[in-house]
Amino acid sequence: MKRPLVVITAGFVLGEVLALCLQETVYRKCFWFAGALFLAALIARHFLGKDQDRYLGRDQNRDLAGNSGRSVTYRILLLIFMFIFSGMAAGSFLGVQSRNQMDREEDRIAQAEFGDVVQLTGQVMDVREKSEKLEIIVNKVKIQWLTLQFPVQLYGVPGELENWEESLLPGKKVKIACSLNLAESEKNPGEFNAKLYYRSKGVVCTGYIKALKESWGADRPFMRVILRFRKYCSRILEQYCEKEDSSIYKAVLLGDTSFMEADTLDLYRSSGIAHLLAVSGQHLSLIGGGIYLLLRKTIGGFKAAGILGGSFVISYGIFTGSGGSAVRAVLMICCLWLAAERGRTYDSLSALGFAALSLLGKNPYLIFHSGFQLSFSAVLAISGPGQWMIREFNIGKNWKKIVVISLWVQIILLPVMAWHYYQYPLYGMFLNFLVLPFVAFLMLSGIMILLTGGFWPFAAETAANVGHVILVYYKWICGCSMKLPGAVRITGRPGPGQIMGYIVVWGIGIAALKWLMGRKLKGQRRAVFAAVVLIISVLIGFTILSPRPVKGFELLCLDVGQGDGFLLRSGRTSILIDGGSSDKKKLGSRTLEPCLKSKGISRLDMAIVSHGDNDHISGLLYLLEQKMPIDILILPAGGKGGDIYGKLEQMQAEAGGRTYYMHQGDRIKAGEMEFTCIFEKETEKERNAHSLVLCTHYKDLHMLFTGDMGISEETELLKMTEIKGSIQQEHLKHVQILKTAHHGSKGSSSPGFLGKMPLKAAFISYGKDNSYGHPSPAVTEQMKKQNISFYETGGNGAWILENKDRKVIIKRAKTSVPAN
């Protein structure tokens, strides 16, 4: 059996994922079910062994050892199952152990109830100077009576920490006054999951340094040299390169993207060439491989060159921050040199499996890190189907090899990118074909800057100019690709079923290619058939991962902090009602935009603004700045002529959309949803007072969105309901779901107003620990008296209402992978 380590790794990864994602009772059932299947196979093998001649035809097709072909196949399958089950057992054991340990650590810290500032002592593991901050990992942490099992990641501002370059060296013990926070999971779909991210780094809690109290003990000389050399390299790059160029060089050579401008980083990601910014095997092959060959020529022998070269690449991996991609590359290149020294054949897939087991055995949560998944998936694509196709189809020309490798890398990375970034660069493969030939020259120019910058300015400036030309070309080609139609396809976050369907499609596609290899076809004809198989598989795969239309109706009450934000969807129709916050300053970029992308929404059919306060429009302003397509922007008629509404109208026009000022009595239909304005004080210029009050209905489900209307507006609305046949009377008597006005303020939601409707549930959107006292206890108590179920955000996360087959369900919105 070939590559047993690869099979064991597959089982190991499966076991860890099940252990970390599923509830303990569920994953145990999966594990025991797999064990029962394995045991059944062993029993069947034992009792059917005597009769295999009759059932398997052993007398007809025997190998040299006397075994039939079917019997050998059976044994191989049994062996594969055994390796997978063994790996799964080990992976699930480590996964459960890691999850339980981190959960216990969190519980201990949460129960300790430390103050806003704590005195922390521990030993510095690593220090990295980022763009405007320091990142310090502290191990062996003790806070008062509590000793932590896991490291703490602290952040600080260099200018505020006196003599930090000497006091915070790795190995030194420190006493620090800092805040301490447990990392939190995302509150809304698509948001960054800080809890999962820090767990992938082996960290449970973070903090911000207030003061560096004391530092003592000896540092680690090797790490001191690494840190000082990293700072020297950073200074040299800043000295000889333009600001944008130096930031890219720091990412490529030093493994630090924090200095890059957000627009530049987003351009590389959206274009599909962000992998150039990660320290990978290509870096180590060029740098470490060059040194290895030089050592082979100078000192001779595989062993000495391998030891010295291995020491260098390990040091370089530490130098770049020991990220998953860098460690993977270090382990694989060391395997390559070890194989050369032993005179054995190097197998990249087995080396990849060894690297995965080494990293995941130390920290199972690393499996969820986007960098880890992208790095390992890319190498899997190159070493697996890419090399197989090159070998089987006898592809000899280098440009053809690059095309095949690029194609398979994009195929394998598609579901990974869709899961983490909710989008896919449609022209990424072609762009990589145009930029990859210059990567080596870019790296060599950066290395020359570092080598000559200290003593030969002319050479460093020349190298910087060469690199500048390449980077200008990269920026230009990326800009051109982004202007092409459909350059970035919004995929949304695919579900597990979609990903499995994608894997099945490509499994069938590879099987079809293997079948094609067995046919006696001439080279050109075979290539045409292979191209047809690939094109069909690509089209079907894209279709499977495309966003699914909503079945029935879905309302998402976002946790936007102190503000409002609701997303309504039915079929392929998407409506945003408000979208702002007074305490989340980057609501648009960190919450609203990721949420829409994760749902596969690239355009909004309609955006409705109840009124122009910042806590209702800040995120929407960001979307308009980004020129997100919004077909119709609805504004309250009472705000016409106001500065903020004029700004919204202008931005909507620049984005290519229409604006409509809604009056009382207006009705708008969008898909199967209908919106009726039942109250709007057109003559009132005070924003809260002229809030749009919308009755929204989908089939038999009726909802009321109230903006920030107060009790006086509620009283006026109630008077209108006394008029027989009025729209107010007609709509309020059917309302089942309420968006509580003004975040649950005591100045809204009067008992008479709540009692006028047959309410079943209400959403209250507010910020945790807000200074306004929202929601008012009087409001929540009144809802309890009237048997109205209310669902609060308040930092606890988004809520989702689903209406399918006339059944209404309200539940917590699904996020990504649960951390516990």
Question: Whereabouts are the PLM-identified features?
Answer:
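N-terminal leader/targeting segments
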Residues: M1-D107, R328, L516
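Core dinuclear metal-dependent hydrolase active-site scaffold
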Residues: L360-F368, G479-M606, A653-I737, G795-N820
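Metallo-beta-lactamase
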Residues: L604-D615, L624, G638, L738-H742
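Cap/insert and terminal regions of metallo-dependent hydrolase folds
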Residues: I632, E716-G797
